[in-house]
Amino acid sequence: MQTRNTFSWIKEEITRSISVSLMIYIITGASISNAYPIFAQQGYENPREATGRIVCANCHLANKPVDIEVPQAVLPDTVFEAVVRIPYDMQLKQVLANGKKGALNVGAVLILPEGFELAPPDRISPEMKEKIGNLSFQNYRPTKKNILVIGPVPGKKYSEITFPILSPDPASNKDAHFLKYPIYVGGNRGRGQIYPDGNKSNNTVYNATATGIVSKIIRKEKGGYEITITDALDGHQVVDIIPPGPELLVSEGESIKLDQPLTINPNVGGFGQGDAEIVLQDPLRVQGLLFFLASIVFAQIFLVLKKKQFEKVQVSEMNF
């Protein structure tokens, strides 16, 4: 009996340990996968500075293109597409956090006018859902529904990102007006060069922190280097740490100067920003325009008919 109870207790403990381990894996895995958009969200209340610069450029130092396409005008309470394109050479490989090479990821931030927001799932058409794919958008802040972020996501599959946007209705939203509005977008491909805390990533160039001679280069077991620079005058030494990823440009015995590059720049990605304009159109104006155009068409038809009638009268008078 005692043996059976002991076996049962061991079985319960193993089951509990597996469950706890699985929960920890799920939680930490989720936090890691969602970490990248949080970098900007945690550091900045608004992703667009007063100068117009989007804060993602503080970490992604290389300048690359980005494009946005939106309708020229939309009606109130209407779902439309905002298509963001982040072009790059699909053959490129970036340096990953572990120093190995891998495919590039992409991400984007879309800054809409106040009142515009992510369309609810039940308002998105099947055709638009197919374009969106498995993307999951999130608000930059719970209180800022007009600012959306996405990423990192695989660049080979999502270099073109379709945002489903719902326009506001001034009839129910007093802060919305029938005006022309600006839309701002920022898009990056690849990892950043600087972390929000100011530290460098391994996806950037590393420079010498002193002038002197490279007296020793030690290659670490897990990748990366320790470079010892000896001052030729007083003999004091400085050790520069290079993380796994960047390739060395210097060798032992070489004389170097302060801020001279020790490695190549491995970054193949970059960040870009752009803008577009959209008009929230008043339906009454559209109806008025259609009525005006219709009246012009009818007037033209009436003039043509009157002209033909006049010509018939002239012909009949000449025959008489």
UniProtKB/Swiss-Prot annotation:
Q: Which residues bind heme?
A: Y36, C56, C59, H60
Q: How is the cofactor bound?
A: Binds 1 heme group covalently.
Looking at the keywords, is Signal present? yes
Naming one, the record's GO cellular component terms include: chloroplast thylakoid membrane
What Gene Ontology terms for biological process does this UniProt record contain?
photosynthesis
What are the UniProt keywords, alphabetically?
A: Chloroplast, Electron transport, Heme, Iron, Membrane, Metal-binding, Photosynthesis, Plastid, Signal, Thylakoid, Transmembrane, Transmembrane helix, Transport
Cofactor section: heme
Bilayer topology annotation = Single-pass membrane protein
* Entry keyword Glycoprotein: no
Q: Name one GO molecular function term.
A: iron ion binding
One Pfam match, given by its short name, reads Apocytochr_F_C
Q: Where in the cell is it found?
A: Plastid, Chloroplast thylakoid membrane
* Chief place where the protein resides: plastid
How far does the signal peptide extend, from start to end residue?
1-35
Annotated membrane-spanning segments are 286-306
Q: Which family does it belong to?
A: Belongs to the cytochrome f family.
What's the subunit arrangement here?
A: The 4 large subunits of the cytochrome b6-f complex are cytochrome b6, subunit IV (17 kDa polypeptide, petD), cytochrome f and the Rieske protein, while the 4 small subunits are PetG, PetL, PetM and PetN. The complex functions as a dimer.
Q: State the function annotated in the UniProt record.
A: Component of the cytochrome b6-f complex, which mediates electron transfer between photosystem II (PSII) and photosystem I (PSI), cyclic electron flow around PSI, and state transitions.
Instruction: Spell out the protein name for this chain.
Output: Cytochrome f
Tell me the classification of the organism that encodes this protein. Eukaryota, Viridiplantae, Streptophyta, Embryophyta, Tracheophyta
Gene name, per UniProt, is petA
